[in-house]
C-alpha cells in the first residue's frame, strides 16, 4: 500500500525519482514495474503496480465492445498507459504525452493513494489541496453503516 506525499523534481528528460517508501512497497510486493497512465479526474499521472494494472485490463476486456461510453473511456485513459521500469537510481521516465497531460514542469509531487500513486505538478497539486471540499462532498471515512 502507498501512503504519504513526497516532493521531487523532474528533469528535462522526464525522469523523476519514485520515493523510497514507494519503491520499498513495490519490492515487498514483488512488483518489478509500474504502469503510468492519465488520471481521469485531474490533470495528473496515475501509477499502478503491474498487478493492479492487470486487474484493470481484465475488467476492460470483460466490457461489451458495443458500450460506447465504456469504449470512449478505454480510448481516452487506458490507451494512455505506458509500462515503465525503474532505473538503477530508482527513477522512472515519464513519457512526453503524460508529462504534457499533467503539466509536469520542474517540481512534482508523488501522492500515495493506497493501491495506486498519483504524480502531480507541484503548483497544480498545491492549488487542488488549497481548495475547500464542499460539506456535502466530504466523505466520513469513520462512519459505520
UniProtKB/Swiss-Prot annotation:
Give the main localization category.
cytoplasm
Task: Offer one Pfam family short name for this entry.
Answer: MraZ
Listed under GO cellular component are: cytoplasm; nucleoid
Q: Which residues form a coiled coil?
A: none
Q: Where in the cell is it found?
A: Cytoplasm, Nucleoid
SpoVT-AbrB domain: which residues?
5-50, 81-124
UniProt-listed InterPro entries: MraZ, MraZ_C, MraZ_dom, MraZ_N, MraZ_sf, SpoVT-AbrB_dom, SpoVT-AbrB_sf
Per UniProt, the keywords (alphabetical) are: Cytoplasm, DNA-binding, Repeat, Transcription, Transcription regulation
Gene Ontology MF, one = transcription cis-regulatory region binding
Q: Which cysteines form disulfides?
A: none
Task: For this entry, list what GO says about its biological process.
Answer: negative regulation of DNA-templated transcription initiation
Q: Which family does it belong to?
A: Belongs to the MraZ family.
Q: How does it assemble?
A: Forms oligomers.
Name of protein: Transcriptional regulator MraZ
